Amino acid sequence: THCLTTAAGAPVARFSTVAGERGAADAERDIRRLFSYGDAARRLGVNHQHIPVNAPR
């Protein structure tokens, strides 16, 4: 993410909106979320239940 910096060194968000109003930052995050969930599912493969950490106890 690209951030600006104030004179005090505190990061300032690139997108600032009114509280409760969805803006470009939220839309961009939603698009990334759509791709990340599918990528994670495909990374584990069809036999994900056989991976020890994913197996039921």
Swiss-Prot record:
Recorded family membership: Belongs to the catalase family.
Temperature-activity profile: Activity decreases at temperatures above 55 degrees Celsius.
InterPro entries xref list: Catalase_sf
Domain of life of the source: Bacteria
Quaternary state and interactors: Homodimer.
Organism ancestry: Bacteria, Pseudomonadati, Pseudomonadota, Betaproteobacteria, Burkholderiales
Name this protein carries in UniProt: Catalase-1
pH behavior: Active from pH 6.0 to 10.0.
GO terms of molecular function: catalase activity; heme binding; metal ion binding
Function noted in UniProt: Decomposes hydrogen peroxide into water and oxygen; serves to protect cells from the toxic effects of hydrogen peroxide.
Keyword Oxidoreductase belongs to the record: yes
Species per Swiss-Prot/TrEMBL record: Comamonas terrigena
Keywords from the named record: Heme, Hydrogen peroxide, Iron, Metal-binding, Oxidoreductase, Peroxidase
Binding annotation for heme: 37
